[in-house]
A protein has these predicted regions:
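N-terminal "domain-start" segment that seeds a small globular fold
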Residues: 41-77, 181-185, 189-233
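Bacterial N-terminal signal peptides
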Residues: 22-31
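N-terminal secretory signal peptides that target proteins for export/translocation
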Residues: 1-18
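Thiol-/selenol-based redox modules, centered on thioredoxin-like
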Residues: 167-217, 331-357
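Hydrophobic beta-strand anchors of alpha/beta hydrolase catalytic cores
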Residues: 86-87, 117, 163, 241-242, ...
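Boundary at the C-terminal end of the N-terminal hydrophobic targeting segment
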Residues: 35-37
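Short, internal strand/loop/helix patches
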Residues: 132-168, 283, 294-332
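Conserved redox-active cysteine motifs that mediate thiol-disulfide chemistry
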Residues: 89-106, 244-269
Length: 357
């Protein structure tokens, strides 16, 4: 069988038309593939949000006094019984958050007089300057607060964005990832309902996690590595290093947060070099934000690192050491005391480890 392309003169109208049609098909294929990938990620985000939030549906909302970036206090418990509450967790580096922001502001404009809308920045590898610039860029008018991790713990944050609707009765009625019909229906129901509020004694908060600063001795903290090994922090006869990170840091933040991405790469390489040069026990502690056990295992299988990994699914270890930025390295001495906490901008990990010996 002859090849129809070979039979067309290279400069003929028929050949040029064929090339244009073929190029259009390639572009269409790329667009459809990208759209399918985006849809798959959206669906996975929704699944994770709903799975993590399933146990909270129908439960009383958290008791918390939120402080906006302007210093205004919002007492959630005082709103229960008077007005529904819509909390949206987000981050400036989050791509789907950016995509949803126009719709989020539109909801504030159309429902803000009937629903207390609050933009809850996760406070995870973010800063006030970036948040203020983001607010200006997207012309956001709802109150914005920065979480210290406690509200995320109360509401089982697993993805960004994550939507939480609390009805007029003070009970959680919707948790999801998508700005979809289910979210809008939940908001409409919350506005129209006339049920009695849950009592303040019923409202719930996650158990407080003890926090340790430099000089403190770590107690009552145990972790389990991906391979099932139990480690009791604060006990042992040798120093330990806890490397707080997320497996998506290097790749996902490469464009939106290049400094953070490079810091994660630098720390990973430094740790790999140091692991063979010291008698310290090294542990990589991954955040549970957008990370499951299988995600972390995939990272271990595809990344050249020998670092034993731990999934901090509910970010309890992150809260225990007040970690809000990745990468952060916590050094414990042989007596279980916090000797040093190195932030992302600290590039003296090698010297800090030598000083601990």
């Amino acid at each position: 069988m002859s090849n129809p392309v070979q039979e067309l003169p290279l400069q003929s109208p028929s050949f040029l038309s064929f090339i244009k049609q073929f190029a259009a098909l390639l572009v269409l294929g790329f667009v459809l593939h990208s759209a399918h990938a985006d849809d798959s990620l959206d669906d996975e985000g929704e699944r994770r949000a709903r799975t993590a939030g399933a146990s909270l549906i129908g439960q009383p909302g958290p008791v918390a006094v939120l402080e906006t970036i302007e210093g205004k206090k919002i007492d959630l418990a005082e709103l229960y019984g008077k007005k529904p509450v819509y909390l949206k967790f987000w981050a400036t580096w989050c791509v789907p958050c950016r995509q949803q922001m126009p719709g989020f502001e539109q909801l504030q404009q159309t429902m803000g007089d009937r629903v207390q809308v609050i933009a809850v920045n996760t406070g995870f590898s973010d800063d006030i300057e970036s948040i203020r610039a983001y607010r200006k860029e997207h012309q956001l008018t709802m109150p914005i607060m920065i979480d210290d991790g406690s509200l995320a713990a109360d509401l089982n944050l697993r993805v960004t964005p994550q939507h939480v609707v609390i009805g007029r009765d003070g009970r959680i009625s919707h948790i999801g990832h998508l700005d979809d019909q289910a979210l809008h229906a939940a908001l409409e129901r919350a506005v129209s309902e006339q049920t009695a509020p849950a009592s303040r004694s019923e409202t719930s908060t996650a158990p407080e996690t003890p926090q340790f600063a430099v000089g403190d001795t770590v107690t009552d903290l145990s972790i389990e590595t991906l391979d099932g090994r139990q480690v009791q922090l604060g006990k042992g006869d040798k120093p330990r290093a806890l490397v707080f990170f997320a497996p998506w840091c290097e790749s996902y933040l490469e464009e939106s947060r290049p400094e953070t991405s490079q810091a994660c790469l630098r720390v990973r390489k430094d740790v790999d070099n140091l692991m063979g040069q010291s008698d310290m026990e090294w542990l990589g502690v991954s955040s549970g934000l957008w990370v499951s056990a299988s995600d972390l295992q995939d990272y271990k299988n595809t990344t050249p690192t020998a670092l034993p990994l731990v999934l901090d699914e509910q970010d309890e270890l992150f809260r225990a050491f007040a970690i809000r930025d990745i990468p952060t390295v916590v050094l414990l001495d042989a007596q279980g005391r916090v000797a040093n906490i190195l932030k992302p901008q600290d590039s003296n990990l090698v010297a800090a480890v030598k000083a601990l010996r």
